[in-house]
């Protein structure tokens, strides 16, 4: 049996589309909503995964409990390194994944101000350089990268895939659409991100370095 709470409707207040009073609320609906909000707010941060980015080598390593899962080629800022407000530099140091955006978007989906525009841009489309496919929005955890979140520093997809492997961004970390989809599906909010200006092998002890991701061999190295 449904129990309804009948709250008097103010004079002139409209009824719902089906002619019933919108103030008649099922308590069960409120409970379900409150539980959903509670679960969302209490979701545990991702402490399992760690992203390490080498601006020196233009590579990104994904670690699972300290073990390397994959290494991807990336593209960091063509303007250099730093975190000054209004700059187009890639910040260094310890950060974390603050927000994930675009989980259901198709490859090449264009984002403006973190909202989908409805446009799809194919890889290497001439003259096009929007943010596409997925966004991992980063928050700095140190004084040297405290402006990263406000500067909209992301790990995101790019249609300029031919530039991956060399500095070409305006501060963000760019990836190929297929690679950012893989990364997005694995890491959660709160995952640690470390950006360094040294080789990955220096930042990640025990890293396998035999695989070269040069322009002649740009494929990601994936360890399963």
Language-model-detected regions and their locations in the chain:
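Post-signal peptide N-terminal segment of mature Sec-exported envelope proteins
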Residues: 48-73
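Well-ordered beta-strand positions in beta-sheet-rich domains
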Residues: 50, 71-73, 94, 152, ...
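C-terminal motif of bacterial Sec signal peptides marking the signal peptidase cleavage site
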Residues: 39-41
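Electropositive
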Residues: 69, 73-105
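Bacterial signal peptide processing site
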Residues: 43-45
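Sec-dependent signal peptide recognition
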Residues: 27-33
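N-terminal secretory signal peptides that target proteins for export/translocation
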Residues: 1-25
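Exported/periplasmic cell-wall-interacting domains
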Residues: 84-89, 105-224
């Amino acid at each position: 049996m449904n129990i309804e709470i009948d709250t008097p409707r103010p004079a002139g207040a409209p009824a719902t589309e089906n002619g019933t009073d919108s103030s008649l609320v099922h308590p069960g609906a409120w409970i379900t909503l409150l539980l959903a909000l509670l679960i969302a707010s209490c979701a545990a941060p991702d402490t399992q995964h760690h992203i390490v980015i080498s601006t020196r080598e233009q590579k990104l390593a994904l670690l699972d409990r300290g073990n390397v899962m994959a290494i991807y080629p990336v593209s960091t800022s063509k303007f250099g390194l730093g975190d000054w407000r209004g700059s187009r530099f890639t910040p260094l140091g310890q950060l974390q994944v603050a927000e994930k955006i675009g989980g259901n978007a198709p490859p090449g989906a264009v984002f403006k101000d973190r909202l989908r525009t409805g446009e799809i841009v194919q890889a290497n489309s001439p003259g096009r350089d929007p943010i596409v496919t997925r966004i991992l929005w980063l928050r700095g955890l140190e004084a040297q990268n405290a402006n990263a979140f406000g500067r909209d520093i992301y790990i995101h997809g790019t249609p300029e895939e031919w530039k991956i492997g060399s500095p070409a961004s305006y501060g963000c970390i760019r990836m190929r659409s297929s690679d950012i989809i893989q990364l997005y599906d694995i890491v959660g909010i709160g995952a640690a991100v470390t950006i360094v200006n040294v080789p990955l092998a220096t930042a990640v002890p025990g890293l396998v370095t035999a695989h070269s991701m040069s322009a002649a061999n740009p494929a990601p190295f994936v360890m399963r």
